Amino acid sequence: MNLKSSQKSDLVSFFRVVCNLKKIKRSGWIHKSNVLSPESVADHSYSMCMMSMVLSEIIDLDTEHIMKMTNLHDLAESFVGDNMPDKISYEEKVLLEDKAMRKIISKLPSFLRGKYLDIWNEYIDNSTLSAKFVHNMVKLEMALQAKEYEFEGYS
């Protein structure tokens, strides 16, 4: 597929949004555990991807689909940040993230937009086995990271 100059520019914009996740710190570790240098959203996402890849293969789920969902699950935070549940209502968080996600995905080639929005909505709805698996991976990664911070002396 040959991309037009504007499509290439849009992809660069999309990838910059992805890379921005490296700069966004996971706020829960700062506010609840006083971690001085917490993991970034990108750190969290990478750990989740590795855990999701291995565990979905072990229990024979659709690993490719789960990997896409895992990669997309926190992408909107590049625009809206890592909001704490006590700072913003769940409904407001979903609205903000949905608006951000639509804007982010609009930079992708048209044949990917609907596919990725469907996966994002599946994750938000949390009604499929894949979505429940990814939500559980969020919790597992957080528990493992908490243990790491505990080893470092945080409580």
Model regions and ranges:
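Active-site helical microenvironments for divalent-metal-assisted chemistry
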Residues: 1-155
